[in-house]
Amino acid sequence: MPKKTYFDEKAAKWDTLIENEVILRLKTMLEELALPQGSKVLDLGTGTGVLIPMLIEAVGLSGGIVAIDFAPQMLAEAQKKYQWPNLEFLEGNAEDIPLADQAVDEVVCNSAFPHFDDLGKAAQEIFRVLKKGGRVSVLHPHSREYINDLHASLGGAVKNCMIPEADVMHAVFSEAGFENITIENVSQRYILIGRKL
């Protein structure tokens, strides 16, 4: 089964699978990122939009959110829930982001990066759409090991969707042009941050 079909078929019930504790972890991670008021943020791999209310709260009405996903039914679920004047939904792939060069200040990618078909190309595209001084944040509300074990156990379309080792992830983003790359991998969170200087 193609990954797009896998996520489209699960879209209607996706939100019921997200535990409250996971939402709280994501809120904490976003608070630590301290997204500047007024910034334009790309939510890459938005899914059903779990981060959208948190992002809107962070950037305020003077900021903006572009939420992109490759699975149209996941996007449809997000659009049912959220309408703000500074929120835009786009269907698209991480390897070919439908935005102009230097379009956003921040790219946040929650629980989506290992699902991209070409991680190197996705990192290059993230770099392209970020403004100079911009930041990428790859988030998971679980450890790398937990995510990889989960995907392996689920099998099917996601069985090979793995977060690479830290040195590989560092190389993927460094080769795309990012600097000041940091990776935190602990029991209840995984965060990679990089800057376009």
Stretches found by the model and what they are:
Residues 177-181, 185-197:
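Core SAM-dependent methyltransferase catalytic element
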Residues 42, 48-96:
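Class I SAM-dependent methyltransferase SAM/SAH-binding core
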Residues 95-106:
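A short acidic, Gly/Pro-enriched loop at the edge of an enzyme's catalytic core
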Residues 120-132:
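A short glycine-rich, Lys/Arg-flanked "PGG" loop and its adjoining helix->strand segment in the class I
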Residues 1-37, 50-54, 73-77, 137-161, ...:
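Conserved class I S-adenosyl-L-methionine
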Residues 106-118:
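A short SAM/SAH-binding and catalytic strip from SAM-dependent methyltransferases
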Residues 161-176:
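Short alpha-helix
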